[in-house]
Amino acid sequence: MTLIKLDTHTIDQGTLPCTDLKNPNSPELFTYNRDWLLDRFEEGMVIIKLDTSKDAFIEYVPAEFAWKPIHAPGYTFINHVYVEDDGPEQWLKSELLQTAETNNSKSNGMVIMLENKDFNRDRDFYLQRGYLEHAHIPGFTMLVKKFKTEIPVPAFAMPISEKSNPLNRHGIRISYADQSAFINYYIHEMKVIFEDMGFNVEMHRIDTPENARESGSPYGTFGVFMDGHFLTHKLLNKHGIEELIGSLDLNEMYPEYKYLIAS
């Protein structure tokens, strides 16, 4: 099996799917912007593909340049391990993970953040390969494999939500990174839908790893907030947004609401 390292010279050898932010209207996966990838290469990102007929790649970066809410100096952060139809043995996925670990054996260790549904699916895969379930924030689990013993362990570095501001009611903030024209299309579709529902919408572009860490979203590069309260990191169509808003306990989010009405 041939391993292909993508860099500024080999980036055009196939596309890379964005496996986290999926099209809300179809199962089709997005692909990253070429310029986005080139900028990430400058930050030390590495992508290794397997020379197969199906998508199979691992993407990792020095944790200091991870666009995620983590603090893990000296570690290597795994953005994605993706294999299309790997089969129950997951040997292609294991090959990619082992390659990344070997390439980064002089670092403090490896860190990966998984959505809880992915963690529940892949828990045994990572635990059997020496990763420890280390920390949690709502919806996400951090796994760590240390290569050195007496070093600080990684940590989440973010506020999940902020105190609501009763003077700025019905405000939606959409924070996003410019990863893909397709993703940006759906983000702006969400903006229109929220505005049609009567919300004031603020768009905030995330343009550095530091911004992503401080965005307030556990996903880092995308988040939707209502008056400072984190709502979702998912791309949603109109039906999804209506379900999201309908599921909120506004009395819990805004305990001062009745007082404001009475005054």
Regions found by a protein language model. Give the residues of each.
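Short amphipathic alpha-helix that is part of the acyltransferase structural core
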Residues: 1-44, 161, 171, 178-182, ...
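Conserved beta-strand in the GNAT
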Residues: 49, 53-64, 77, 82
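Conserved acetyl-CoA binding element of GNAT-fold acetyltransferases
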Residues: 69-85
